[in-house]
Design a protein with these regions (language model features):
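Intrinsically disordered, low-complexity regulatory segments
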Residues: 1-162, 166, 462-463
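Conserved short loop/turn motifs at secondary-structure junctions
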Residues: 1-3, 101-104, 181-183, 254-263, ...
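Basic, low-complexity terminal or inter-domain segments flanking catalytic cores
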Residues: 2-3, 79, 90, 118, ...
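Amphipathic alpha-helical transducer elements in NTP-driven molecular machines
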Residues: 9-16, 33-36, 40, 76-87, ...
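C-terminal or mid-to-C-terminal helical accessory/interaction module adjacent to the motor/catalytic core
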Residues: 93, 135-219, 254-258
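Metal- or metallocofactor-binding catalytic centers and their adjacent structured scaffolds
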Residues: 232-265, 271
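Secretory-pathway/luminal and periplasmic proteins that interact with or process carbohydrate-rich
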Residues: 295-301
Length: 690
């Protein structure tokens, strides 16, 4: 028999239904010569420092750097049952082959391989690599399985990423926490991302507004302006000279310009667009598109390609015809698609661009969640715009003279709407007001206009804008390679698959907060970046590391070279920072400590309230209760101060008004806090005996 291991139960069930495994067992499905089981995300992870040596339970400078000679892994808390099921299935004598069917990417490869290794499995391994959950795509994937060894370099890249995160997180966090006597959390990718947000915020704070004035003349719905004046009286004089006067277009620099259609979406460009249009966070967009991928409505989401493979031309034409009839904003739209614009196998690595599948044709789109529906409309519209004609217009840069004063006017004249027609229809459908563009005007050199109205406007120079998720994702993608072109080798902070989680972690850790659409550093975030060295917070260096991980996946760089470089950096930091000046330590003095709300059940130290959690004050202890706890939220409750105090004092709380996730009805139960002694706190439901 063949054992198929997916990344999550829902994917496993979808695969099982296609390959004929339909008999449900405990933790797997059986049938037609297959056993189909699943992980639940990561089941196995790297051991904590204290699992290498008990002395590492205490954070001490003299123990640094901590660099394992032989890396150890362990089964993660809360996943032991499913790991046990997989281990038993792998060792079953009936199983002669194991098929890795986790997500077709770096992290999916790691999830499976760590389970395979931890279980001590030596059986032949195959890899299922698909970009769609459609039935035919699954059948084709199982018909063309590759040997697992073909993905060894991808596994090494994933393993290096995990080890690098461990080395930087463990050593840098301990080093600077000990030096400053504060619990400072440092992350390999998280910290440089925070540094960009802090740097932008600092530039805004340091910006000094400067006032300036412009004189205007208005004629025939046209508005021409002067250059900037520092003094209002100078602008007033020009406006007075031109009131009721005639003007002449002295120069008209006309250029025909062509704007090519946008490319198809990769994950980052989709997240950016959804943030611009709907205000969705990167994580919300990823969750929506992942859910629709599992519903077979769109292709694999965690891609960095904006093209399709050359052989997808015919199927793309069929897809477009379906979308024209299915999408409500496409009603009455007529255009000749040119699919050759989106085909380029050389620019597709692991997965092609995100597009809808033909399953959309029979789907009831109206029954989708609102967010999913909007994202599906975006993805579908991008297929249409990407294959549409270019937008062509005449650009007019006019120099206008009025009573010996010079004014300037920019205008345009559209010659071909092209893909803009589809974009306008989509925005009208969503009720989005189009951005202000240059006016469409009939104007040419030598023509006289007037008499003119004139006035003066007051303006201020503008500071840089705070990052939104849209602009931060762009900055993360370009980090270390600001002059990014289509053919440039990509570096960047994180990957399309991880950037959303990085942003969310910064917010959950209390380093960044959302202010409407903006991402703004907190006081803790500002202070952390102030004291860390450039090597740790440099986006460019971290981007170089990300590129090195890509090289490992491509088998052009070795894992040892990469990890040796990280280790040397940690050794250098520990040697350089043996002490901290009193001046720098004072940056942490006087910081308000959160209110003590109880005692830690793990170590007995005080538990204090923070911005996003209630955590143990002993930095050697990781006990934390999160204010946005997902379990309590799923039951209609919050982890507020009163709730946290009750859990710490009694260990459980009895509720009469919990809310069922399935039915929405209220029910009665006791929520018991279960502390495993390490890792995350868990909660159990105890129902009253009837």
């Amino acid at each position: 028999m063949k054992l198929v291991i997916a990344e999550k139960p829902s994917v496993a069930m979808a695969l099982a239904s296609v390959i004929g495994a339909r008999t449900r067992k405990d933790g797997y499905v059986e049938g037609n010569g297959y056993l189909v089981s699943w992980c639940v995300g990561h089941l196995v992870g790297l051991c904590d420092a204290s699992e290498y040596d008990e002395k590492y339970k205490k954070w001490r400078y003299e123990d640094l750097p901590i660099v394992p000679e032989c890396w150890k892994h362990r089964v993660l808390e809360g996943t032991k049952k499913q790991f046990g099921i997989l281990k038993k299935l792998m060792r079953d004598s009936k199983v002669d082959e194991v098929i890795c069917a986790t997500d077709a990417g770096r992290e999916g490869e790691l999830i499976f391989r760590l389970v395979y290794e931890q279980a001590g499995c030596k059986k032949p391994m195959k890899r299922l690599w698909i970009s769609s959950m459609e039935e035919q795509a699954i059948k084709d994937g199982f018909a063309s399985l590759k040997d697992g060894s073909c993905y060894d370099s991808l596994y090494q890249s994933a393993l290096c990423r995990a080890k690098a995160d461990w080395l930087v997180g463990i050593n840098a966090s301990r080093l600077f926490s000990v030096l400053y006597n504060q619990n400072l959390k440092v992350g390999r990718v998280q910290t440089p991302t925070l540094a960009m947000i802090v740097d932008r915020n600092q530039k805004i704070k340091e910006f000094t507004k400067e006032k300036y004035y412009m004189a205007h003349i208005k004629f025939d719905e046209m508005d021409a302006v002067t250059e900037h004046f520092q003094k209002k009286e100078d602008a007033d004089r020009v406006a007075a000279d031109c009131m009721e006067r005639m003007c002449e277009v002295e120069k008209d620099d006309v250029k025909e310009k062509t704007v090519r259609p946008p490319k198809l979406y990769d994950l980052t460009t989709l997240q950016r667009e959804a943030n611009r249009m709907f205000g969705y966070t990167a994580q919300q967009t990823l969750d929506a598109v992942q859910e629709m991928y599992e519903q077979k409505l769109v292709t694999y989401p965690r891609t960095d390609s904006q093209y399709l493979t050359d052989e997808m031309g015919e199927s793309t034409e069929t897809l477009i015809q379906m979308l024209l009839g299915k999408m409500p904003y496409a009603e009455g739209l007529e255009y000749q698609p040119d699919v050759s614009k989106v085909l380029n196998s050389k620019k597709v690595s692991d997965h092609h661009a995100i597009i809808p599948t033909m399953e959309v044709a029979k789907a009831d789109i109206g029954k989708l969640k609102e967010r999913n529906r909007k994202i599906l409309y975006l993805i579908s519209a991008r297929v249409l715009t990407a294959t549409a004609a270019p937008y062509i217009y005449e650009s007019h840069k006019c120099q206008i003279t009025c009573n010996y004063h010079t004014f300037y006017l920019s205008a345009k004249k559209t010659k071909q709407e092209g893909f803009k027609t589809i974009e306008k229809k989509l925005k009208q459908f969503f009720g989005i007001i189009a951005e202000k563009e240059e006016p469409e005007l009939d104007i040419w050199a030598g023509k006289h206009y007037g008499p003119c109205d004139s006035f003066v406007s007051e303006h201020f120079t503008q500071p840089p804008k705070q990052y939104t998720e849209d602009t931060l994702l762009s900055a993360m993608e370009r980090a270390g390679n600001e002059e990014l072109t289509e053919d440039t080798e990509k570096k960047g902070l994180g990957t399309p698959a991880t950037r959303a989680a990085i942003i969310e972690k910064l917010i959950q850790s209390g380093f960044v907060k959302r202010e409407k659409k903006n991402l703004v550093p907190t006081d803790d975030g500002n202070v952390l970046i102030t004291v860390l060295p450039d090597e740790i917070k440099s986006p460019k260096m971290t981007a170089e590391w990300e590129m090195a991980l890509n090289h490992i996946a491509q088998n052009t760089e070795t894992a040892d070279e990469f990890l040796n470089g990280i280790t040397e950096l940690m050794q250098e930091l520990v040697a350089r920072y043996q002490g901290i000046s009193e001046e720098k330590k004072e940056q942490f003095q006087g910081k308000a400590k959160g209110e003590v709300i109880g005692k830690c059940p793990r170590c007995g130290a005080d538990v204090r309230e923070g911005k996003v959690n209630f955590s143990c004050s002993d930095r050697n202890c990781a006990f934390t209760l999160w204010k946005n706890d997902k379990f309590l939220a799923s039951q209609g409750k919050k982890m507020d101060k009163t709730t946290a105090k009750k859990f710490l004092s009694k260990g459980k709380i009895h509720y009469k008004d919990l809310v069922s996730r399935k039915t929405g009805r209220q029910y009665e139960a006791t929520v018991e806090m279960v502390d495993p002694g390490e890792g995350n706190v868990q909660f159990n439901l105890i129902f009253p005996q009837r």
